[in-house]
Amino acid sequence: MSSGFSHMDGDGSITMVDVGDKKDTRRTAIVRGKVEMAPATLDMLVKQALPKGDVLTTAKVAGIQAAKRTWELIPLCHPLFLSYVDVRFTVDESLPGVVVEAEARTTGQTGVEMEALVAAQVAAMTIYDMCKAVQKDIVLRDCRLVYKSGGKSGEFRAC
């Protein structure tokens, strides 16, 4: 029984993909998401006037740490040697809120999409955590892979 899913064996049971015979290639993944909040909350974030301190620096560190621990959080992910992880933020008053962008890179046998996704989501959740004292209805949305390269499937760019 072939499901087409790489994490299922012939019997339909889950399995960790064997990447042992795959060639090492340079791999990159970029993920983007949004954290929407009230203009007043965004203003406090920009002015570093929130009770918990410097939101974006804390969120950046949290996202980078999370990327490095992805294999511990997602059951069938491989532990990877990440050569680069970054989390970047753009304040967007038209949202209003913050656009979170996470990038992960490696040279290896499997991709870094999950690491970039986890980095972006944890960074966004950290922004929520640090702002929730002044606003509870902050919205995390539209987190998605926008670019990947490397491996057998090659390059992907979201429309």
Curated annotation (Swiss-Prot):
Top-rank taxon, per record: Bacteria
Pfam hit, one: MoaC
A Gene Ontology BP annotation from the UniProt entry: Mo-molybdopterin cofactor biosynthetic process
Transmembrane stretches, start-end: none
Signal sequence, start to end: none
Keyword 4Fe-4S: no
Gene3D superfamilies: Molybdopterin cofactor biosynthesis C (MoaC) domain
E.C. number(s) listed in UniProt: 4.6.1.17
Residues at the catalytic site: D129
The keyword Lyase is annotated on this UniProt entry: yes
Pathway assigned to this chain's UniProt record: Cofactor biosynthesis; molybdopterin biosynthesis
UniProt KW keywords: Lyase, Molybdenum cofactor biosynthesis
InterPro entries: MoaC, MoaC_bact/euk, MoaC_sf, MoCo_biosynth_MoaA/MoaC, Mopterin_CF_biosynth-C_dom
Any one GO molecular function term: cyclic pyranopterin monophosphate synthase activity
Chain residues that bind substrate: L76, C77, H78, M114, E115
Family named by the database record: Belongs to the MoaC family.
Functional description taken from the UniProt entry: Catalyzes the conversion of (8S)-3',8-cyclo-7,8-dihydroguanosine 5'-triphosphate to cyclic pyranopterin monophosphate (cPMP).
Subunit-structure text: Homohexamer; trimer of dimers.
Name recorded for this polypeptide: Cyclic pyranopterin monophosphate synthase
Species classification: Bacteria, Pseudomonadati, Thermodesulfobacteriota, Desulfovibrionia, Desulfovibrionales
Underlying gene: moaC
